[in-house]
Design a protein with these regions (language model features):
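Short, Lys/Arg-enriched N-terminal segments with co-localized hydrophobic residues
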Residues: 1-9
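Non-heme di-metal
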Residues: 10-180
Length: 180
């Protein structure tokens, strides 16, 4: 099934198999990494008392986020929520079953046991991320996002009003904020 999904995704990506696709992937990765670096740099600047420099790093990070989003869209990387949950779960699965385990083995072979342990620990976190995404996907597939078989506590994401029941209200009875 993963191969079928990949084929469907490739059909949406008009750049599939080209150097342009590789360039778009590199642009997306570069902009994504720059965004994260700049948010880290903003934290340091703020801690050191450089509020204006911190704000500039954050503004630039937001610009880089938009650049990354542009390239990711070109690669047909953004779907509906169901497709995004599937892609996220698959990505997390790769990270914990393959990537981090291989990184850990290499780190051990090269004499970095502490780093190997850290790679494995992060791999465990990625496993939980996959499980969470798959549970959310199941909620969509079984129409259990806003309705459960057992009583739950539902909180309005706008005003904080609490409703206890099997179904979230379509509209908050306090602030009239819609469920969706």
């Amino acid at each position: 099934q993963a191969a079928i999904q990949e084929d469907e995704k490739m059909a949406k990506n008009k750049y599939a198999g080209t150097q342009t696709e590789k360039n778009l992937q590199e642009a997306f990765a570069g902009e994504s990494q720059a965004r994260n670096k700049y948010t880290y740099f903003a934290s340091v600047a703020k801690k050191e008392g450089y509020e204006q420099m911190s704000a500039l790093f954050l503004k630039t990070a937001d610009n880089e986020k938009e650049h990354a989003k542009m390239w990711f869209k070109e690669l047909a990387g953004i779907g509906d929520t169901k497709a995004n949950l599937e892609a996220a779960a698959d990505g997390e699965n790769y990270e914990w079953t393959d990537m981090y385990e291989n990184f850990a083995k290499t780190a051990e072979e090269e004499g970095f046991p502490e780093l190997a342990a850290k790679f494995r620990a992060v791999g465990e976190i990625e496993k939980h991320h996959e499980e969470r995404y798959r549970a959310l996907l199941k909620n969509i597939e079984t129409a259990q996002v806003f309705e459960k078989s057992e009583v739950k506590v539902w909180e309005c994401r706008n005003c904080g009003h609490i409703v206890v029941g099997t179904k979230a209200p379509d509209v908050c009875p306090v602030c009239n904020h819609p469920q969706i």
